[in-house]
Amino acid sequence: MEPLPILYSFRRCPYAMRARMAIVREGFRVELREVVLRDRPEHMMEISPKGTVPVLQLLDGTVIEESLEIMQHVLDWELSEEEANWVERNDGEFKHHLDRYKYPNRYEGVEQDEHRALASVYLSDLNTRLGQQPSFSNALSDALFPFVRQFANHDRMWFDAQPWPNLHAWLEACLASEAFGRCMVKVKPWVSGQDRLLFPQAEGTL
């Protein structure tokens, strides 16, 4: 049996989602190991003690622990200055406010509405940029939309009511894509000794 790189992932995690999107787009075959975060596999913890997903172990033993670095490796993606700026804002300021909007009870002294408003500054800027040309590359869209999706899903009625037509259209296109459907295929948590699960699966198996 042909050896394959191993990807430890968690289906709903936006960081893991962006890594899987790159893998699907490129047709980069891996063995997918779905993780239960409260019971992380021993092998995953051995190769990546920080214990977060995604983790990609290459055939030569190299371990890539950051989602953006996995995207760059799989896609051979060299970010432009604009792309790097958007990813930095997404992973920095937006993710900071997203976490406090979605999980206010995890943080002391947090006002949920305040963080929704602060996150909306980024989303409004994103809406403006999406109305311009040239449009975002698939790689950049895939790096960003899982986090916007998470924000939108927390209160979809509120999100849909905002004056962000370009953002709404972009997100819906991302979610309706064949690549996203293949990225989000449901699998059972991995257990040691089971038959390996190839990812992405052949199109006809979804």
Q: Could you tell me what each predicted segment is?
A:
Residues 1-122, 129-134:
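GST-like domain detector, emphasizing the conserved glutathione-binding G-site
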Residues 80-86, 181-191:
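Short, flexible loop/turn segments with low-complexity composition
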Residues 125-127, 151-152:
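Alpha-helical transmembrane segments in multipass membrane proteins, preferentially the mid-helix core
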Residues 109-114, 155-162:
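Acidic, serine/threonine/proline-rich low-complexity intrinsically disordered regions
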Residues 135-160:
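GST superfamily/GST-like fold recognition
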Residues 114-122, 162-176:
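Extended, well-ordered alpha-helical scaffold segments
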